[in-house]
């Protein structure tokens, strides 16, 4: 990765201090696959070093057996980590340790595949081997180190693609090929366009495109895994994309920075816990769906575009010790369909709304249990069920008639908020 603009670069520098603040999280207590406690884990397997013992990350994951530890170097890898039906054993997990590595989802554009159709306007008819509406809705370019969405985000508002004649230097657009894109198929065909100042070389614009869908991806039946000390940035989908039926999976000290969709997202019947998460500049900070069961502790979320916290369907979710700097369209939404029931526990959570007020939403068929919750510059709308213990919602004490102090703000800000964001929490 060439660079990540301030304040994002500060997040990486914050790693050393952040690692020292993370506490152990009790297991979820899910039925089925047993969950190992930290003192029950056996460290007796092999050490597999990517680049030495295995040529690639995927080769290392494939060869890892219960008790083995995969090691990355603290460098940038233009690669991803995919776990597909990977299982350790109770007390002998497969450990994937990034040691501060970054999984970069974007690649510099191939200049030979972009043709100049008029001065400063470049076109590419085949940027990806396959394109559909889901990918296009998440799409962005990294332009001289900065993420360029053109006012579009996957789970939020999407500005119409600009017409070619309206495109300004530093902007991009997409034009659908209606003859090739058939209504019966989800596949899209068309042309991406990049606009730079006439006379400037395309190479000088320093543009990258997201060529991988995720930083870390789980699919199928995975069990007894520990994934830690890793940053995912610039995939067109999720930083950490968790599908399938995983059990006894732990993420420790992970970061999702500027991802096209969710920082981290659980799907289907996934069960995992996260002990230390930084999620910045994504479409959503956390989005968990279907029947997943997840637990997050020691979390910082900021500068997301659509949702900061989005919990859906029939899942059971918990968030503890968290700070959110909310600039998104929706700070907190808990939602379920008529035949579903979603539940969320919040404990010691601070959400500060930065600008335009937008309420937290507990929709019908949703249950919120909140303890030591503080919401600042925002209200809460409850259409489902909500219970409160020692909470402050925009200065209002909940439950009513009981003195409340809310989240432990001083401790949360000191321990979880990167230095680049500290000043935002010193303001009233």
Locations of regions flagged by a protein language model:
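Residues at the C-termini of beta-strands that transition into short coil/loop
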Residues: 99-100, 107, 268, 283, ...
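Bacterial N-terminal signal peptides
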Residues: 9-20
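Extracellular beta-strand/beta-solenoid scaffold signature
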Residues: 83, 112-125, 180-182, 209-217, ...
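Extracellular beta-rich repeat passengers
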Residues: 206, 222, 229, 234, ...
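Extracellular polysaccharide-degrading/modifying enzymes targeting complex plant/algal/animal polysaccharides
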Residues: 26-234, 241, 411-427
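Bacterial N-terminal signal peptides that target proteins for export
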Residues: 1-11
